[in-house]
Amino acid sequence: MDLTAARKSYREDGVVFVPQALDAKALAEALAAYDWSLANPGPLATKFAQTTDATFYNDLYNPGCIAAYRQMLEASPLPKLITQIWETPDIWFMYEQVFLKEGGESRRTPWHQDSSYLSIAGDDLAVAWITFDPVAKSDSLEFVRASHKGPLYNGSRFELGDDTAPLHPDADMPRLPDIEEMRSKFDIVSFAVEPGDLVLFHPAMLHGGAPTHPGMRRRTLTLRFFGRNSIYDRRPGPAGPRAPGIHGRLKQGDPFRDPSFLKLTP
């Protein structure tokens, strides 16, 4: 991999595609972690569907995740790769999120920025998007190039019928644009992805996922990480990451640190 090009793409575009970043062993360990999450739903596990024959399952912040994921994370090539792209030696695991879309027609994942839901900011933040099924470019995660540079929009409530309905109606944050209705006005990028490939993006990137169609299955694991320069950045309402007492202890602009987050050795 050309690290110079990857760094430039990540800093300027907010997203980089890394073919075959995970070898067979690392991919199998990631899949085992994903399967553990499906078999052990956490308190935030949710199933969305528009039809009875479609599954759209999502889970995150599972309290058993660290114990179940630790071995996979410590053996994974991802921490080293991400710190090489960041050009910083420190990396912590923030949280996991799993998605399962299969069966009939399921809605697309509305456009949003993860950072709208997270009280953390900084350049050295990353979401590692891993698929366990081949995904065509037309069916893949989509990004608005360079949108991590701002603005930070009000989060979507993911309401049926209005993808831009604001999470914080009274907050002084711009409302999400209706990107699906104005796609030609945005520089949208996506990638055809095979198992073992990695899509790495900054959580402030505007992104959304295509729907699934009958006969399709899309199993996705996302792993979120933060680095040394990350700071606490309060949101207008309740926000992640979830760590006991962190939102009462940290003040605006404090270094983002908490012993509950697993520090990894690149």
Residue ranges and their predicted role:
Residues 1-13, 18-111, 116-119, 236, ...:
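Non-heme Fe(II)-dependent double-stranded beta-helix
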Residues 40-51, 156-158, 195-200, 204-266:
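Non-heme Fe(II)/2-oxoglutarate
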Residues 78, 103-106, 123, 134-137, ...:
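Short, charged/polar surface micro-motifs in flexible loops or helix N-caps
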Residues 89-91, 95-96, 107-109, 124-130, ...:
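Generic beta-strand structural signal
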Residues 97, 113, 130-134, 143-145:
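Short, structured patches in soluble enzyme cores that scaffold and shape functional sites
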Residues 114-116, 125, 207-212:
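Glycine-rich phosphate/pyrophosphate-binding beta-alpha loops
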Residues 119-137, 192-193, 200, 224-227:
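Short, conserved beta-strand element in jelly-roll/cupin
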Residues 137-206:
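Double-stranded beta-helix
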